[in-house]
């Protein structure tokens, strides 16, 4: 759906009017996010910046590019989606990120960090070639500047001098504490001997002036302070303005006017407060970055915490248990210590934990080097972000067969974050790489055993995946067993057809097994466990069964059924195999159960499909 109409007239000369608009937007964001969940604190903090952008620029002539775009809620509200905003992150509702198919005002799809400047450079090149008026305007957070792609784009932009405005929304906090030398270097400039000596001399001179002009000392000091952090960007050929107050509409608008007139690359450094306007969230950065539904008055979650551990918790608890006994274990993550559960390792063993910032490629390559030196790096990473490091996996880990351990969180359909965050690709691209061992647990107990197996596996890289939230298989349905390289586990032998589950697909297959049993159809159930190497005894295991049905939460192309069919082909075995994996399209956002139902992957739909394949009807 394309939403064309705007709902607000924004006069850059009417600051009081713009302040009312900002308050209206904040109220709406709080109203909807408290009901639906979403990215709250960054969206609240960026309101004045976005209102100012819209007040001065036509975003269809000057494309607005939102880095990651989780902070773009105010933009959505200003571009015809005020009423429909109530459907934010809901199935078939508005996306939580910018999405061109949703609105003509959303220039580019976003969800992963640090791409905005690169996109902007591409737009600027195209505008130059077309001799088009206008310039790209990128809004990016301080966490975004820790990624290599930001510097790659900045390097070209500074050299070619394309007209472009970048607004650095500096709220002093990305999802977790910002990591890296740049932010430290900028702050060190303020503390360096040249700056300190110069400031001391200036203050000494100004102190001799009459008291009536003493205010000059503080004003001069502040002015010098504003110039200093820009040295880094100025040396790259980027005009730097700031820091400015990112909640002062007058200051933002005047600065944007100046940047517009320069017709060169400009970085505006705006300091904001995450959670601005909602006292409970102000200053509590990580807790309020991404939230579920909550009570607006108290800030308390509307969802009670499950007594069952999440897969992330089961993983992190086991890793911590092993780390107590094995000093060679180290934890590595790319700006997601809390999300991946590695924050527990930070607290217990800070010297053995490495947050490399938004630098997935560096995470994998540096981990490979640690593995070469005899350490056991557990790289804890979301499936959707692992794809950013594919070359490092191939070139730096697998060619030399270095035993890094990839703990792939949020594998499968993740729900409300949608296309940019679904964890559906890792199975297909990892199984194409020589020397990679790939396996998956079916529940929390086997996940713990997967971590133990990975810790002991020292001959090659290995990867194991687990879902967000919870496994489909309830705890205790099957006795947990340890992992043995390349061995599957036949959980139920009796039946004429065989249901094969991989990872979270075991739980899905088990539910179908129970549903078919009610139809007097007995099914055997196999937990494949290892995708690579696949069980060499698989041909004997499947021999008694007429048909095979494969369940796994990854893309069908290059997926689990493909691996099984390749194996059978090499063995010259003809056996009907039907895949219940994900179809070849990007999967929309929404409640996971509703998304699965729309794909025909709920228990009822799967049961009907098998009945139909068997020539029976429900």
Q: Where do the protein language model's features map onto the residues?
A:
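Cofactor-binding active-site loop characterized by glycine-rich and histidine/acidic residues
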Residues: 18, 22, 31, 40-160, ...
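Nucleotide/pyrophosphate-binding catalytic subdomain
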Residues: 28, 43, 52, 298-305, ...
């Amino acid at each position: 759906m394309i939403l064309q109409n705007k709902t607000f007239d924004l006069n850059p000369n009417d600051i009081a009017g713009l302040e009312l608009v900002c308050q209206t937007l904040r109220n709406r964001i709080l109203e909807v996010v408290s009901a639906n969940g979403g990215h709250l604190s960054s969206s609240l903090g960026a309101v004045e910046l976005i209102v100012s952008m819209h007040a001065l620029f036509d975003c269809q002539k000057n494309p607005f590019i939102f880095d990651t775009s989780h902070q773009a809620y105010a933009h959505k509200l200003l571009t015809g989606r005020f009423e429909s905003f109530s459907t934010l992150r809901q199935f078939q509702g508005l996306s939580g990120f910018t999405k061109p198919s949703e609105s003509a005002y959303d220039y580019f799809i976003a969800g992963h960090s640090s791409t905005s400047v690169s996109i902007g450079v591409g737009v600027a090149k195209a505008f130059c070639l077309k001799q088009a008026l206008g310039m790209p305007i990128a809004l990016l957070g301080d966490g975004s500047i820790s990624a290599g792609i930001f510097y790659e784009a900045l390097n070209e932009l500074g050299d070619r001098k394309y007209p472009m405005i970048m607004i650095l929304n500096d709220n002093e906090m990305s999802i977790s504490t910002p990591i890296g030398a740049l932010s430290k270097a900028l702050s060190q400039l303020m503390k360096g001997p040249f700056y300190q000596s110069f400031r001391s001399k200036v203050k000494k001179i100004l102190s001799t002036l009459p008291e009536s002009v003493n205010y000059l000392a503080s004003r001069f000091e502040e002015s010098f302070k504003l110039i200093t952090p820009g040295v880094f960007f100025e040396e790259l050929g980027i005009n730097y303005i700031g820091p400015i107050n990112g909640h002062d509409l007058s200051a933002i608008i005047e600065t944007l006017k100046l940047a517009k007139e320069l017709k060169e690359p400009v970085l505006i450094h705006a300091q904001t407060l995450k959670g601005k306007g909602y006292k409970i969230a102000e200053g509590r950065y990580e807790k309020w970055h991404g939230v579920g539904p909550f009570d607006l008055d108290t800030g308390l979650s509307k969802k009670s915490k499950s007594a069952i551990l999440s897969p992330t918790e089961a993983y992190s608890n086991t890793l911590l248990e092993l780390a107590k006994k094995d000093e060679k274990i180290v934890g590595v993550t790319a700006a997601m210590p809390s999300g991946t559960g590695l924050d527990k390792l930070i607290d217990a063993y800070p010297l053995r934990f490495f947050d490399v910032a938004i630098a997935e490629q560096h995470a994998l390559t540096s981990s490979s080097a640690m593995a070469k030196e005899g350490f056991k790096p557990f790289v804890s990473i979301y499936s959707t972000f692992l794809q950013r490091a594919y070359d490092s996996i191939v070139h730096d880990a697998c060619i030399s067969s270095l035993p890094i351990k990839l703990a792939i969180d949020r594998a499968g359909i993740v729900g409300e974050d949608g296309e940019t965050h679904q964890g559906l690709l890792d199975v297909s691209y990892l199984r194409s790489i020589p020397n990679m061992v790939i396996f998956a647990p079916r529940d929390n107990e086997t996940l713990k055993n997967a971590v133990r197996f990975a810790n002991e596996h020292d001959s090659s890289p290995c990867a194991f995946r687990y879902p967000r939230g919870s496994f489909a298989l309830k705890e205790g349905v099957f006795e947990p067993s340890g992992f043995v390289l390349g061995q599957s586990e036949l959980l139920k032998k009796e039946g004429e057809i065989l249901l094969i589950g991989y990872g979270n697909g075991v739980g899905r297959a088990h539910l179908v097994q129970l549903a078919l049993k009610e139809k007097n159809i007995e099914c055997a159930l196999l937990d494949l466990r290892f995708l690579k190497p696949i069980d060499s005894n698989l041909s004997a295991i499947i021999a008694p069964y007429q048909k095979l049905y494969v369940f796994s939460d990854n893309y069908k192309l290059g997926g689990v059924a493909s691996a099984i069919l390749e194996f059978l082909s090499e063995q010259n075995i003809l056996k009907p195999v039907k895949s219940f994996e994900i179809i070849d399209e990007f999967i929309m956002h929404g409640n996971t159960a509703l998304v699965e139902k729309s794909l025909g992957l709920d228990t009822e739909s799967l049961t009907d499909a098998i009945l139909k394949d068997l020539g029976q009807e429900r």
